[in-house]
Amino acid sequence: MAISASAGAAPVITIDGPTASGKGTIAHRVAKQLGWDVLDSGALYRLTALAALRRGLPATDEPAVAAVAQALDVRFDGPHVYLEGRDAGHEIRQEEVGNYASCIAAYPGVRQALLERQRAFRQPPGLVADGRDMGTVVFPDASLKIFLVADVEARAQRRCKQLIKKGISANLDDLLRDMRERDARDTQRAVAPLAPAADAHVLDSSGLTIEQTVQAVLDFWRA
């Protein structure tokens, strides 16, 4: 492992990357192999987006959306996630919610409101955290930092298959356009832009299977 975590803190592996780079799947599989907890930080932004949408708030109303993030009523129970007492696992994966989440993720008030919630997931024996700023902002002292990249066309095809498998209608051209727009927002935002940490291992998963990518992360950890 490349770096030691802060003294007394549970070890963390961060897996950052753009939309549909496979970071969520990889994080869950690595966590399962190690017997660690997993943090899907994107789910918190999507839950904030869904809560704001339920209240009819436009994504441009930064103060109101930040207030929603501050008071977010969520509960994670294994593979299930509950928003205000209702299972929201299916709803937060809809593209409308994802696009809204990408917009509000640029707001400093939203990011600050969710920062400590994310850090609270750090518990023994360890945590695998996936997102966009896990290694740069949320867990800068992580023991291992991975930055997953993949060709945008490959990512759009991957997301299309995921949505169809879940019974959600999807159009590849629309997904490709949305993904390019989301990539631009994520990399160009003023607060915590999407970029690999200076000490991150950049891993291109375009030509790798899920199993090969998981093994590559585990190899980095055990090196």
Swiss-Prot record:
The keyword Cytoplasm applies. SUPFAM superfamilies: P-loop containing nucleoside triphosphate hydrolases (SSF52540). One of its GO terms (molecular function) is dCMP kinase activity. CDD domains: CMPK. ATP binds at G17, P18, T19, A20, S21, G22, K23, G24, T25. It catalyses: CMP + ATP = CDP + ADP; dCMP + ATP = dCDP + ADP. GO terms for cellular component: cytosol. GO terms for biological process: nucleobase-containing small molecule interconversion; pyrimidine nucleotide metabolic process. It is found in: Cytoplasm. It comes from the Bacteria. Its EC number is 2.7.4.25. The keyword Oxidoreductase does not apply. It is an enzyme of class 2 (transferase). Belongs to the cytidylate kinase family. Type 1 subfamily. This is Cytidylate kinase.
